[in-house]
Amino acid sequence: MEVNGTANILSSAFLAVEFVDSFLPQNPLQEPFKHAWNHMLQNYTKFQIATWGSLIVHELIYFLFCLPGFIFQFLPFMQKYKIQPDKPETWEKQWKCFKMLLFNHFCIQLPLICGTYYFTEFFSIPYDWDTMPRWPFLLAQCFGCAVIEDTWHYFLHRALHHRRIYKYIHKVHHDFTSPFGMQAEYAHPLETLILGAGFFIGTMVFCNHMILLWAWVTFRLLETIDVHSGYDIPLNPLHLIPFYAGARFHDFHHMNFVGNYGSTFTWWDRLFDTDSQFNKHYSHHKTAKSD
């Protein structure tokens, strides 16, 4: 009964989105995007698109999304939104982070990205424009990928905090007790592989077009950079996502080292009561702020 009820809710939500979409004017960017996509297909092989194209998307999106947080450190009026104002970013920390990122991106992630082509070939994932899913489907698929990745991340992340293995792997990610956006993928190579597997599980379940892979990469990077940003900015559109964790939730994990293990959502932490210390801390913070 619960499964049927959930299915009915999702079906109704999708029909509502379709209904709203029918009244929206045609996207003026659709034709230029279609032209650019077809131009890419005509001038590059599938291997080039799946490997070098995916690498370019990842690097461009990653550092583009890191840019606002990097600029915030130079803007005095943004410091009121910094969650740990007593721990500013330093050039030394950022340079250390950047060097680790370059190693992880090109020595760990690039070989994995090279496997994207063989993944799309094995599962017959299309690249063409005509079979590209419409935006309601794309959003739903990205959400499904996020649910799977968050579940994997919660349990494996929590396991990496076990006292017998923490200092060997996950401790690297906790080098910075006050996170900043660029630190999102700063991790031990083994952690990159272990937690990164959750990204690919969702892709294997939901991917039915090359564009979904790039859309999911974009959303995942946006989310992880946001929660590591160190800034709790009001009117953040990501907070419209139900059960979204956000920067303050994850910042506490870096400050406290335990609890708040979810990557995107808060439901697993609520279910297993691993957010209890955060809830007490946040209640105290709100009380102090109101006084």
From Swiss-Prot:
GO biological process, one term: regulation of chondrocyte differentiation
Transmembrane residue ranges: 55-75, 100-120, 199-219
Fatty acid hydroxylase domain span: 145-274
Positions occupied by motif Histidine box-2: 170-174
Cited Pfam families: FA_hydroxylase
Entry EC no(s): 1.14.18.9
Membrane topology annotation: Multi-pass membrane protein
Assigned keywords, A-Z: Endoplasmic reticulum, Iron, Lipid biosynthesis, Lipid metabolism, Membrane, NAD, Oxidoreductase, Steroid biosynthesis, Steroid metabolism, Sterol biosynthesis, Sterol metabolism, Transmembrane, Transmembrane helix
Domain of life, per lineage: Eukaryota
Cofactors (names): Fe cation
Pathway field: Steroid biosynthesis; zymosterol biosynthesis; zymosterol from lanosterol: step 3/6
Localization in the cell: Endoplasmic reticulum membrane
Extent of motif Histidine box-3: 249-255
Motif Histidine box-1 in this chain: 157-161
An example Gene Ontology molecular-function term: iron ion binding
Reactions it catalyzes: 4,4-dimethyl-5alpha-cholest-7-en-3beta-ol + 6 Fe(II)-[cytochrome b5] + 3 O2 + 5 H(+) = 4alpha-carboxy-4beta-methyl-5alpha-cholest-7-ene-3beta-ol + 6 Fe(III)-[cytochrome b5] + 4 H2O
Entry comment, domain topic: The histidine box domains may contain the active site and/or be involved in metal ion binding.
UniProt cross-references to PANTHER family, sorted A to Z: STEROL DESATURASE
Family in the record: Belongs to the sterol desaturase family.
Name this protein carries in UniProt: Methylsterol monooxygenase 1
Gene symbol of the encoding locus: msmo1
